[in-house]
């Protein structure tokens, strides 16, 4: 159902090309938001690996060149993880870069542009290993 609950609100969603992130992005759009997705997967959104500082900086410049405020940041991107016995040090470091460092840095980049009453939503789940 389409409403205008978030009409003209600027929303950022990491990992918004598929799954939960895609549903979140679609729902915000259905409620009138202007949604910016960043994802590693090719598509009609900003494509980039958020584990890289320069990618996050370029994304922030892109968003802020069009809007001077951000109302919602949804940190949703997380790489698939293996169990501790199968996960290499490098894979774990990458997971930390995407799931922790990128979330911190993205908020830091937009901090002075957050609208009054802005929301920061951090999503974490291990459900993919339970289904």
Features from the language model and the residues they span:
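Canonical Rossmann dinucleotide-binding motif of NAD(H)/NADP(H)-dependent dehydrogenases/reductases
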Residues: 4-35
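Rossmann-fold cofactor-recognition segment
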Residues: 40-54
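Conserved catalytic-site loops of classical short-chain dehydrogenases/reductases
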Residues: 71-72, 93, 118-123
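Conserved NAD(P)H cofactor-binding loop of Rossmann-fold oxidoreductase domains
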Residues: 76-81
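A short, exposed helix-loop element centered on a Lys and neighboring polar residues
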Residues: 107-108
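Catalytic loop of short-chain dehydrogenase/reductase
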Residues: 121-131
């Amino acid at each position: 159902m389409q409403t205008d609950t978030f009409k003209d609100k600027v929303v950022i969603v990491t990992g918004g090309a598929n799954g939960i992130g895609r549903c979140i992005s679609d729902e915000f759009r259905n409620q009138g938001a202007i949604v910016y997705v960043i994802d590693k997967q090719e598509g009609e959104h900003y494509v980039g690996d958020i584990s890289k500082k320069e990618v996050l900086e370029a994304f922030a410049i892109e968003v802020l060149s069009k809007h001077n405020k951000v109302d919602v940041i949804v940190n949703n991107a997380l790489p698939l993880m293996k169990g501790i016995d199968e996960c290499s040090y490098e894979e774990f470091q990458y997971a930390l870069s995407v799931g922790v460092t990128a979330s911190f840095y993205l908020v830091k980049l937009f901090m002075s542009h957050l609208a009054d009453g802005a929301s920061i939503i951090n999503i974490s789940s291990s459900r993919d290993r339970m289904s």
